[in-house]
Amino acid sequence: MALGRHLSLRGLCVLLLGTMVGGQALELRLKDGVHRCEGRVEVKHQGEWGTVDGYRWTLKDASVVCRQLGCGAAIGFPGGAYFGPGLGPIWLLYTSCEGTESTVSDCEHSNIKDYRNDGYNHGRDAGVVCSGFVRLAGGDGPCSGRVEVHSGEAWIPVSDGNFTLATAQIICAELGCGKAVSVLGHELFRESSAQVWAEEFRCEGEEPELWVCPRVPCPGGTCHHSGSAQVVCSAYSEVRLMTNGSSQCEGQVEMNISGQWRALCASHWSLANANVICRQLGCGVAISTPGGPHLVEEGDQILTARFHCSGAESFLWSCPVTALGGPDCSHGNTASVICSGNQIQVLPQCNDSVSQPTGSAASEDSAPYCSDSRQLRLVDGGGPCAGRVEILDQGSWGTICDDGWDLDDARVVCRQLGCGEALNATGSAHFGAGSGPIWLDNLNCTGKESHVWRCPSRGWGQHNCRHKQDAGVICSEFLALRMVSEDQQCAGWLEVFYNGTWGSVCRNPMEDITVSTICRQLGCGDSGTLNSSVALREGFRPQWVDRIQCRKTDTSLWQCPSDPWNYNSCSPKEEAYIWCADSRQIRLVDGGGRCSGRVEILDQGSWGTICDDRWDLDDARVVCKQLGCGEALDATVSSFFGTGSGPIWLDEVNCRGEESQVWRCPSWGWRQHNCNHQEDAGVICSGFVRLAGGDGPCSGRVEVHSGEAWTPVSDGNFTLPTAQVICAELGCGKAVSVLGHMPFRESDGQVWAEEFRCDGGEPELWSCPRVPCPGGTCLHSGAAQVVCSVYTEVQLMKNGTSQCEGQVEMKISGRWRALCASHWSLANANVVCRQLGCGVAISTPRGPHLVEGGDQISTAQFHCSGAESFLWSCPVTALGGPDCSHGNTASVICSGNHTQVLPQCNDFLSQPAGSAASEESSPYCSDSRQLRLVDGGGPCGGRVEILDQGSWGTICDDDWDLDDARVVCRQLGCGEALNATGSAHFGAGSGPIWLDDLNCTGKESHVWRCPSRGWGRHDCRHKEDAGVICSEFLALRMVSEDQQCAGWLEVFYNGTWGSVCRSPMEDITVSVICRQLGCGDSGSLNTSVGLREGSRPRWVDLIQCRKMDTSLWQCPSGPWKYSSCSPKEEAYISCEGRRPKSCPTAAACTDREKLRLRGGDSECSGRVEVWHNGSWGTVCDDSWSLAEAEVVCQQLGCGQALEAVRSAAFGPGNGSIWLDEVQCGGRESSLWDCVAEPWGQSDCKHEEDAGVRCSGVRTTLPTTTAGTRTTSNSLPGIFSLPGVLCLILGSLLFLVLVILVTQLLRWRAERRALSSYEDALAEAVYEELDYLLTQKEGLGSPDQMTDVPDENYDDAEEVPVPGTPSPSQGNEEEVPPEKEDGVRSSQTGSFLNFSREAANPGEGEESFWLLQGKKGDAGYDDVELSALGTSPVTFS
């Protein structure tokens, strides 16, 4: 044993006097490293940052730092101010972490003070090098592979379910691997066998690293996936012209590869490659590629990668590259280029076959030899990176047929043109029909070819197509430009659409000529100004490009030189806000909406009106078109919408109806008039959007008005939030469904040329963000169709005695109407009660006593199952109902705070003709099956289970898809189906499997009415159980950096975390929230907290909980929507309780991590402390023996127990005494499996704290070396008798050695004496056991073995081996089967579930009593040795 070297007095002193600092975790940071996860460790105390002294700094301390910072695993722990000396205080002299703590505050450490006052300096400042939070594993290098993040314990793969390119970009940038080239599923790399990370990352693409990206927890703790996400990065991140070049547009080519600059070899270097670099650097085009060493420095590292550019790429790393197999490169043969700067030069479009002199770069005079003169372009797509594919051959441009056309083919086209990744491969002449020859047909590219004409095909010019089958592509480098402002068209924040995302433009430096180019491109006049005094813009977005310097010859922003495009080209305060000269604005006021009212124009800072002389429908058409308000319905005069104020800008306006702006129509001239404000003109427009072709104004094909005609909107990327905005704008309630072109006749007109990207909180469709479709035509299979609920609210009103009793009224298209009782049932009534938060329905009384005669009656018939959350979620028959008398209107009496279970029935109801279901007539249930979702964390996500004939069973996932999931979500009133999961995603169920091969259309009322194999027929097992995730899945949390029971209140709804509004939020509501979160019974609303940063949904307002509510979901509230209030009204709650942490670490933990030793001379000796109810506490030494110590040592992985220490020998602990009268058998795997008094119940003081000393040592503490400053000077009086301590330790070591030698001698002697009599001696063993049992019954024999007192080691042979039962334990009682052989049952009551009673040894059993060293055969010798943690040994 090597215990001696671990027991230096200095190390023991430090361990004993290490002070635990309570309160919140110390704030940490790493400084002066190359990234966030390495550097000098600094601690913030009293508002000031200071360092940690590197004395005794270990990998375990570094591991805790990395875990606290979310930086993965510790891979280095340099001291000696490796990252430079810090400034300011030295706050910590040492830390003593075990390595499993979640924060440094959980470790023992020195008092926090400035140790510079004690003579210490920054020369030993501690540092850390962490692995980082994310890595790419399993690929061909650090820049490609499976995405894995570090939990603080292990690397865990990330699901590919909702993994985005924006997230991949963050990962590649963080790893120094350039930009993301592709995001793949599990097929490229070997799938990890570990679990999948339980969160989805929602990066926007601008974050500095993955750790700070927003995250969303996966329902049930497991993300839906088909494998782990895979990312391939480019590795190349920057390019420059450097060294001896005379300017930034001339010099040697160098690339930043994984953080290092390297020169590029001239092998295969061509003018086409050089042209790409000049374009990328904003240096015009390449003039020449000079050879020779005059541009080269000998110290450069040479990169032998060979690029194969066509010359049209935007970035060098967009070109095909051969990274392997290149020859060695001399310094005289590195690539260089001289760019034109601001000259314009056209580069021939050639393929990548270049004639090059051996051993030298292409010279300035040698033009590239083009072995293939074909050229490629995209036309009619609105830009060079989207459109119909055309190839030039033999002087003629021709097209490609769409037979077999797919993304692999499109990838080749996009790569060849330098347009990034392929987003879409279009067919059917999506960008219009071409003309001329059709060059290719039946193309079958692998996606890796350098040119599209090198892919397999029918042959050049061979086809069976017409131009209506012309192929097209949309690439990621497609660009667009806009200004963003709430109320202006020609002034606002300048944004570009790039790489699939809108982002801002930087203003530094932006001269007048650049602003003029932008204004002309946007049709906003010929000049403008840059506004640098506008307030900082809210929210986050990319800043795509900086240093734009347009020239007089440029006609668009895309032609202007600039810095390279990247995600963060500047800071948010440098985003450009531009005013163009033509910045007049127009609005309609006092008309009740944006699209009707008095016409007003803003000019030179003043709003003025238009005189109504000659004002007619043609003038109104121009106004409606200009505002995006559809067609003109009326042109009002004589101040129909009230009189305005300010100037009268126009009079005698005489538009033709075709003008783009009303001030461009003929008139008397600006400010020329003979009117007053009694003659102010107005308009009434139809509005921007309508639903057409349905059965009313609230369902149908989505159409928007272009100013000329109604145009349908594409269903390609149409979303539910967009539908919600449309329904709300039209006064049609909420969106029930979004469909394709099936239910309604497709319009003959063109499709709207933009995609709407509504968040759901916009007041109207016009104000939603939009993205232009490439080529002006959106990809679609038809027009988008929306069905709105029409019904927006429900109430119980009139003669009812409370809000939970009365006549049922519904708000239909903005008007309240009573509901006829036709088909009114208790199931329908129960949904109304639930929706209003009024409990369940008690009865549905009929008769006029709850009715007023003036009500309008709705004859809609609802067919609820009773489980829906909203009445309008039920199937409804709106047409064909009979007339309804006022005496037959629906009514209900709800329980209020009563609880009553409603039978789950289908929608077939027996009802008397002409009357509502009476209170006495219970519904007739033709089908008593029930449906539920389990193990998903809420009622709207989980494994699908059906109750039939008293048994809950599951559905097999064969053919399980979103149509099936839609039926389930609708049936449960859980909104839209977001995901249909298979493979027991929410865990395997039990019981029968009721359905298999389900094939729903999505419109069935109940899932068991869908076509299937038949009830109970299947060929599945429960590992194929189906599940769903619905949009109404809810969760609740508080968000705070350092508190568990205080923070910003957030709900998870519709797939996103969002905040809760605080107005009005009374004490009872706060109490319900605190109880639901396990944070006590009361709390307070904090209104003085600062405004929260960032943007998020604000899902719900006006929450008013009642005394009977047990969760937030039961409380009445305002309607749930995206923006229910302003950011300053978000709720911040502080609860009085403190939710106890279930684990001492941040992550899930095992029993081993809930047990520790403190105050000892090594990590395997000390006072026993256990974690319970959120805090560490001690164990009382009553009944504490070597058996209990053995369990502790084994649980901690510290070998065998050497001593069971009592009487607080390692110092008294503090806090609770969690356990008393612990009684173990010695074989338990965990202390929790032993019998004990109930948690926290003891009659002890800390002077009786139990401890252990184990044989093993898990860590090695550094010994003190000469010349190292000791801590005894600053910490006096730790040990007054060091000699006594050494004597005790030496004695213990000696006794342990004596015990081991004695045991080995006994075993060896017995084996030699008995080796020839194995059978006879085995019989003798059992006789001896019987004799021992007889002896134990007496309890008075002096020969009996007893527990050895702490100080008694006189008789080594009688020291009980761990696990030996106490003599006080009888053996006559029959031991229950669940306690035999140490098998544990679940912990119940006050016991830690294992009895110290030993089972009777039976035939074939290995009893613990055999470990007492009695005679036995060789098999028992093996057991004896194993009990001491030693491998069986054969002695000769």
UniProtKB/Swiss-Prot annotation:
Residues that carry a glycan: 162, 244, 256, 351, 424, 444, 499, 531, 717, 799, 897, 979, 999, 1054, 1086, 1173, 1214, 1393
Tissue: Expressed on subsets of CD4-CD8- gamma delta T lymphocytes.
Keywords assigned: Disulfide bond, Glycoprotein, Repeat, Secreted, Signal
Region feature (Disordered): 1337-1410
Domain SRCR: 28-131, 134-234, 239-340, 376-476, 481-581, 586-686, 689-789, 794-895, 931-1031, 1036-1136, 1155-1255
InterPro entries: SRCR, SRCR-like_dom_sf
Biased amino acid composition, Acidic residues: 1348-1358
Entry's localization field: Secreted
PROSITE patterns: SRCR_1, SRCR_2
Disulfide bonds: C66-C130, C97-C107, C172-C233, C203-C213, C265-C329, C278-C339, C309-C319, C401-C465, C414-C475, C445-C455, C506-C570, C519-C580, C550-C560, C611-C675, C624-C685, C655-C665, C727-C788, C758-C768, C820-C884, C833-C894, C864-C874, C956-C1020, C969-C1030, C1000-C1010, C1061-C1125, C1074-C1135, C1105-C1115, C1180-C1244, C1193-C1254, C1224-C1234
SUPFAM superfamilies documented for this protein: SRCR-like (SSF56487)
Signal sequence, renumbered to the chain: 1-25
Compositionally biased tracts (Polar residues): 1384-1393
A Pfam family of this chain: SRCR
GO cellular component annotations of the record: external side of plasma membrane; extracellular region
Name the UniProt record assigns to this protein: Antigen WC1.1
Source species: Bos taurus
